[in-house]
Amino acid sequence: MNTKIFLSVSLFLLSACSPASTPIETPQPPTATVVSANALTSVAPAGDGPALANCPIFPADNIWNTRVDTLPIHPMSEAWIDNIGRDEGFHMDFGSGSWDGGPIGIPYNVVGGSSVTKHTVEFYYPDESDAGPYPIPENPGMEYGSDHHILVVNTDDCKLYEIYDAIYENGVWSGGSGAIWDLHSNALRPDTWTSADAAGLPILPGLLRYDEVLAGEIRHAIRFTVENTAGYIWPARHQTDDPQDGVPPMGARFRLKADYDISSFPPEMQVILRAMKEYGIILADNGSNWYVSGAPDERWDNDMLHLLDMLTGNDFEAVATSMLMVDPNSGEVK
């Protein structure tokens, strides 16, 4: 989201922040224009990047899909973790069931075919938004809480459409900002531009999805939030505050320490923990400290997810990723 903005599948949503001041129509169950996310979730063959509904979730050589378990520790690791909260616990901000009136997690919609209506969205930050149009299905899965994110994958062209603060009133969609991503491309947002996330990054590639856990392997970094950020580093493109010593920037990558013993956790949680060791977590938005993002799914076991609450900042370390960069305007890695 942009500097003026924000602290800020199954087909449902996240509970977050405070309610928006503008009234919003309560999302209803997706109509036939939305294909079941569970039915279309695909797990890529070994060596490939993540995939969804026969579309890649960015190329295999994208920074989101790159392991960081052998990279050096970032020189600011200790300071950043102290700033966020070394002894503060993690929280998996997704699950099954509902909370505060809506399902728990960030939803995504999968659409395709001529029946999908494309909408011109009226943005209140148009200077950093992609004009569209946006293929928004009737009654889309939308994030509950204050951010009202809508995420849509169009299988016709394998493009990802993301909107922040989406509101539908009087037959017209409006929003704070919007971004369109070619899922076959490593191109980043223009430098200093927001997206539907404060870091100027896409949201979908960082979501934990139940089908990945079911398949036994997650091959991408995971989105998370903290309260205070300053500046931004590659691959992020946007900041909510100017750089400050010791305050983590948008785009910072962290990983679970290699010696953290995961053997006592249930197998499903070990899949998530291995991903945190191998691919790490990416700071993408302002929110509660150490809140980890995922897509809602009735198959999640919330009690099991709460076992990960025992993770603390002290179990992680920041990673130096700049050596992987090929071009500052690309997510491609060496």
What are these regions, as identified by a protein language model?
Residues 9-11, 41:
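Low-complexity proline/serine/threonine-rich segments in eukaryotic and viral proteins
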Residues 14-16:
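C-terminal motif of bacterial Sec signal peptides marking the signal peptidase cleavage site
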Residues 24-30:
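Intrinsically disordered, low-complexity proline-rich regions
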Residues 2-9:
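Sec-dependent signal peptide recognition
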Residues 18-20:
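Bacterial signal peptide processing site
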Residues 30-334:
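Short, surface-exposed polybasic-aromatic patches that bind anionic ligands, especially phosphate groups
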